[in-house]
């Protein structure tokens, strides 16, 4: 009986030790996005701090609109162990092999407009990081609506930081 209780206590201690660390406190070490420990932890592709809204819109081009997205879901992020002569050849060709960053689906996006200053003589440069603290994305101009779709993909978006 003593052995089973000792084994149980040892097993519980090993489980507690193997658990990942708890979430860091707000503003503490590890609460940022890995780039100088600042910003939102959901932002995977950050943009430079000195980039303006006008520069970001130019990077998106005329076929896409600059958007600020509250939610991003990333699929992928896998490490594959392939065996055999041609193991993993197909997945590496389509870009889903080891180290693939996965597909980012953005949701709850709002358009970021380039505002015209009221005082014409004073140039104002709005920094993109001051306008949007979440995921900054270039969303395709599309008249489609995904409100009643099963999958719900109306506006395909690409993270701005991934194309810089």
Swiss-Prot record:
Disulfide bonds join 60-138, 68-132, 69-109, 139-157. Induction: Expression is repressed during growth in liquids, whereas several days of growth under aerial conditions of solid culture induces expression. GO terms for cellular component: extracellular region; fungal-type cell wall. Glycans are attached at residue 50. Residues 1-18 form the signal peptide. Pfam families: Hydrophobin (PF01185). It is found in: Secreted; Secreted, Cell wall. One of its GO terms (molecular function) is structural constituent of cell wall. Keywords: Cell wall, Conidiation, Disulfide bond, Glycoprotein, Secreted, Signal, Sporulation. InterPro entries: Hydrophobin, Hydrophobin_CS. Belongs to the fungal hydrophobin family. Aerial growth, conidiation, and dispersal of filamentous fungi in the environment rely upon a capability of their secreting small amphipathic proteins called hydrophobins (HPBs) with low sequence identity. Class I can self-assemble into an outermost layer of rodlet bundles on aerial cell surfaces, conferring cellular hydrophobicity that supports fungal growth, development and dispersal; whereas Class II form highly ordered films at water-air interfaces through intermolecular interactions but contribute nothing to the rodlet structure. Self-assembles to form functional amyloid fibrils called rodlets. Self-assembly into fibrillar rodlets occurs spontaneously at hydrophobic:hydrophilic interfaces and the rodlets further associate laterally to form amphipathic monolayers. This is Class I hydrophobin rodA.
